Each structure stands twice: as structure tokens, then as C-alpha cells.
Amino acid sequence: MDLNNRLTEDEALEQAYDIFLELAADNLDPADILLFNLQFEERGGAELFDPAEDWAEHVDFDLNPDFFAEVVIGLAEQEGEEITDIFARVLICREKDHKLCHILWKE
């Protein structure tokens, strides 16, 4: 993989959020979609992290944080706080030539 051909943090966040919006209607309860849409402006967010260790239970490849990121999308209790109501965790490959993502949806 090429370190010089990676998505920036902002690009990774934007790409993961776009994928979330495209697939949310098929993967979330209608009530959760309504809540997310009503509250996102005030309490919503997307945060970028290194991939959590539990991804190893869901994928069978090396999750090198140089090339993979986890984007957590959801709602916080108040603006500026940590996201506590998680609607999706998106694992995304940051290498521009490898369009790979995996999503764990709110149950």
C-alpha cells in the first residue's frame, strides 16, 4: 500500500459519512433514522479513530492504522461531547485506489 496515496482524515470522514447516508435507510430502524435526522444538527457527529481491536472478529485482514480508519457516526448527549448513541461504525480503507468499507450498524 502507498502511504502517499491515502485519503486525508477529512476525506475519510466525508467518504464514510456519504456511505452511511446512502445505506442507512436499508440498515437502520425508521425510528432511528428519524431521530438521527432530527438531532444531527445539534448533537450529531462523525469521529475518526484507529480501527478498534474488535474489527478482527468481523474482517480477516490486517488493520494497519496507516491504511484503515474507523469512523463512528452518531449522536452525543450535548454538542461538543463524545458520541454515545452510535448509529454506525464504518471501517474504511484510506488508500485511494482501494475502495473498501465494512459497516457495523446499530442493532
UniProtKB/Swiss-Prot annotation:
One Pfam family of this chain: DUF440
Gene3D superfamilies: dsDNA mimic, putative (3.10.450.140)
InterPro entries attached to this UniProt entry: dsDNA_mimic_put (IPR007376), Put_dsDNA_mimic_sf (IPR036763)
SUPFAM superfamilies associated with the record: Putative dsDNA mimic
NCBIfam families given in the database record: PRK05094.1
Homology family: Belongs to the putative dsDNA mimic protein family.
Reported function: May act as a double-stranded DNA (dsDNA) mimic. Probably regulates the activity of a dsDNA-binding protein.
Protein's recorded name: Putative double-stranded DNA mimic protein ECA2319
Organism: Pectobacterium atrosepticum (strain SCRI 1043 / ATCC BAA-672)
